[in-house]
From Swiss-Prot:
Pfam family, one: SurE
This protein's GO CC annotations: cytoplasm
Gene for this chain: surE
Cited InterPro entries: SurE, SurE-like_Pase/nucleotidase, SurE-like_sf
Descriptive protein name: 5'-nucleotidase SurE
Location (main, coarse): cytoplasm
Required cofactor names: a divalent metal cation
Domain of life of the native organism: Bacteria
Species whose genome carries this gene: Ectopseudomonas mendocina (strain ymp)
GO MF entries: 3'-nucleotidase activity; 5'-nucleotidase activity; exopolyphosphatase activity; metal ion binding; nucleotide binding
Length: 249
């Protein structure tokens, strides 16, 4: 089996090295990742300039593009053999609830949705790498176990691992996405020449972290696994809107 590994923290990030090391003796792994940190890139594709893959001394491929660019090229001709699976991560930082809309880590996995096997996105709830071995352990276990799992086509499994040593993890839970409140206001800055600018501020506080959500699971010390799909159709709204257009046109 061939696995394409990518991330959004960049090709030199410790998380992708930990993920590659965890999977290297399980499958043939190819790493294609952004040349620099592209956190928050979501599913952006680069359309205004050419992409230039560059082979690194460790065998990884660095790309001057987004996480989705990396997987897109990896599945569509850059490699001699098409990968069987896409695994993204290990992200340093949570991808919970609404975070999945912005996450390059999750987007890289979503770009692998066309393959027969489920794609995975792994995140550790820390900006520090100390507990990457915990996340790598669960990455290996879950990727190995996918062969016993029958899922609908185009399923992505979003996995968030608490920032704990392995022996302190309480277990694994299947979850739904929670929700955040509106993000904090952007932070205004002024450069020495008087030009104003803004930094995007912190994500919103947890609004729905009730039992059954990914937020609740990780706060209780459990690894959270949330199945995702691309279809964002709001079916309940469709039912509510039934007949609405007839009264307008």
């Amino acid at each position: 089996m061939r696995i394409l590994i990518s991330n959004d923290d960049g090709v030199n990030a410790p998380g992708i090295a930990a993920l590659h090391q965890a999977l290297a003796d399980y499958a043939e792994c190819v790493v294609i990742a952004p040349a620099e940190d592209r956190s928050g890139a979501s599913s952006a594709l680069t359309l205004d300039r050419p992409l230039h893959p560059m082979a690194l001394s460790n065998g990884y491929i660095s790309l001057n593009g987004t996480p989705t660019d990396c997987v897109h090229l990896g599945l569509n001709g850059l490699l001699e053999q098409t990968p069987d699976m896409v695994v993204s991560g290990i992200n340093l930082g949570a991808n919970l609830g609404d975070d999945v809309l912005y996450s390059g880590t999750v987007a890289a996995a979503l770009e692998g949705r066309f393959l027969a096997r489920p794609a995975f996105a792994f995140s550790l709830l820390s900006r520090l790498p100390d507990n990457l071995p915990t996340a790598a352990y669960f990455a290996r276990k879950l990727v190995e176990a996918h062969e016993r799992l029958e899922l609908p086509p185009r399923t992505v499994l979003n996995v968030n691992v608490p920032n704990l040593p392995l022996e302190h993890i309480r277990g694994v839970q299947l979850t739904r996405l929670g929700h955040r409140a509106r993000a904090a206001a952007p932070v205004k800055v002024v450069n020495p020449r008087g030009k104003e600018g803004y930094w995007i501020a912190a994500a919103g506080d947890v609004e729905d972290g009730s039992q059954g959500t990914d937020f609740h699971a990780v706060m209780q010390g459990y690894v959270s696994i949330t199945p995702l799909r691309l279809d964002r159709t709001f079916n309940e709204a469709l039912e509510t809107m039934d007949g609405w257009l007839e009264g307008i046109f």
